[in-house]
Amino acid sequence: MGVGAKTSLVAYAGLLSQYERANVIGTKDFGEILRRHVLDSLSCLLFTPLKNARKVGDIGSGGGLPGIPLAVALPDAEVTLFESTGRKAEFLRYAVKELGLANVRVVNARIEESARDDDHRGKYGVCTARALARLSVVSEYSLPLLRRGGHVVAMKGRVDADEWTEGGRALKTLGGRVSEEIQVHYLPDVEQGERRLVLLEKTEETPEVYPRRTGTPARNPLGAK
């Protein structure tokens, strides 16, 4: 990563720490934002499919994590930030403009709606989701957006046995599978909780009935007993 990209990442951390119109990340501490959020987002690049992606969708982008750091690191990729909350989407547009990121667009809509939109359904090579929801919910949000053979990078903390089982059932229904998992180990001076990256692969076309109606995936997770 070149000096320009590193400068942009530092500038982005500054935008997050100084923005006053909405609480987009939960902390205003610049150092914490840079270490625990911006740099953590770059751990997605441990997966080769993301490094080679040409069209990336960041689901539930919030303050732009991991989407904006990835857009900085992957200037040849088209990155779409999906965010349903208006004030957060407003910040995303502001940050994209301030950082001069010509390869990023912001979509302010519920992800269930976007995933049924022909402009987005089946169009992405990689989707990302950082600490968003259970694997089953992330799968229902993201697999419809992917082309066949595409991948999801789910940035998770601890995943218990029930979540793995539920996620496996959901993936079978949606036409996907877990293809890889990485435990991220940080340097001792970086205060970071457990970070697990789960790579999902879309192996079959997702049935047209998914995702279900807005709010249903979160209220009634696919694969839950």
Predicted regions and their residues:
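Class I SAM-dependent transferase core
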Residues: M1-G57, R87-V104, R213
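Residue-level signal for inorganic ion chemistry
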Residues: L16, L70, K156, L200
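Conserved SAM/SAH cofactor-binding pocket of Class I
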Residues: L42-E140
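Short strand-turn motif at the edge of the Rossmann-like AdoMet-binding core
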Residues: S84, L132, M155-V159, Q183
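Short alpha-helix immediately C-terminal to the canonical SAM-binding loop
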Residues: K88-E90, D160, W164
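Helix-to-beta-strand junctions that scaffold the AdoMet/dcAdoMet cofactor pocket
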Residues: L146-R148
